[in-house]
């Protein structure tokens, strides 16, 4: 049931011309309806508890929730039932069609799903251009948490601003042995960066890091094609290059794997 608890609560499955929730259809194959409804009930319990705590001053004053939300990474948003199979897509579901600012996420979790319901309009939300698997190690986030903790004695400390300069990275999770490894990056920076590089570190061996330079394909678009890499798991960091006085977008990190040849 825990896997079902990760499914969207909003209508994210397109069947015909309509978007429905997982619990509203029996047409999706391999879905256990009972577990789907149990998962929805679990979230309803959380919602009810949040509502009851709104009237509990002692509970409200015990802690502060500060969500850290990854953005600017290509993220799957919905799925369409096509010939009996679900096809995932980055297209926003109908319920979010008028919210184009929700079109991204951290590469795993859509932006809308990363924001707790009770904090939908909160200034405590923190947004960072980083991938899901690297959020907990992101230097800017850790520095932000450190500064927030050190200034808790100030009742009205200024809110930490969102990141202006960002890097968004599109990279597949898995590559075949003879398949080129294509990385695509979207860079928002004022002033423009002068270069972009990828530092690829083998995670499953002691081989030294490899550094590759992106080519700029359009104003904010950069592309890198790595012809081949030995089979293994790799960490990749995308790093902007600029002048000494320029404030650069913070690096973005992710993982990918090259599999052994399958005969």
Located regions from the model:
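Short beta-strand elements
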Residues: 243-263
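Surface-exposed, short loops/turns at beta-strand junctions within beta-sandwich domains
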Residues: 226-233
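Helical cap/lid subdomain of alpha/beta-hydrolase-fold lipid enzymes
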Residues: 1-161
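Extracellular acidic, Ser/Thr/Pro-rich low-complexity tracts
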Residues: 186-192, 202
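Extracellular recognition modules
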Residues: 235-239
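Short, compositionally biased P/S/T/A/G/V-rich stretches that sit at domain boundaries
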Residues: 149-182, 188, 261-263
């Amino acid at each position: 049931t825990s896997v079902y608890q990760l499914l969207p609560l909003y209508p994210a499955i397109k069947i015909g011309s309509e978007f429905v929730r997982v619990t509203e259809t029996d047409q999706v194959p391999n879905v256990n309806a009972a577990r789907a409804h149990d998962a929805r009930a679990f979230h309803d319990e959380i919602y009810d508890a949040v509502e009851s705590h709104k009237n509990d001053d002692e509970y409200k004053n015990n802690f502060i929730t500060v969500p850290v939300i990854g953005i600017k990474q290509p993220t799957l948003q919905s799925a369409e039932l096509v010939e009996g199979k679900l096809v995932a897509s980055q297209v926003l579901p109908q319920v979010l069609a008028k919210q184009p600012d929700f079109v991204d996420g951290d590469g795993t979790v859509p932006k809308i799903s990363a924001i707790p319901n009770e904090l939908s309009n909160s200034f405590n939300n923190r947004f960072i251009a980083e991938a899901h698997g690297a959020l907990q190690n992101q230097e800017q986030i850790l520095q932000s948490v450190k500064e927030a903790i050190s200034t808790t004695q100030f009742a009205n400390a200024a809110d930490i601003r969102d990141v202006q300069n960002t890097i968004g990275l599109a990279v597949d999770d898995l590559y075949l042995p003879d398949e080129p490894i294509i990385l695509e990056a979207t860079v928002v920076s004022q002033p423009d960066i002068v270069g972009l590089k990828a530092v690829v570190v083998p995670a499953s061996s002691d081989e030294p890091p490899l550094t590759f330079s992106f080519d700029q394909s359009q104003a904010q678009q950069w592309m890198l094609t790595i012809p081949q890499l030995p089979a293994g798991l790799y960490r990749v960091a995308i790093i902007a290059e600029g002048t000494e006085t320029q404030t650069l977008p913070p690096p973005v990190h992710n993982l990918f794997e090259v599999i052994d040849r399958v005969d």
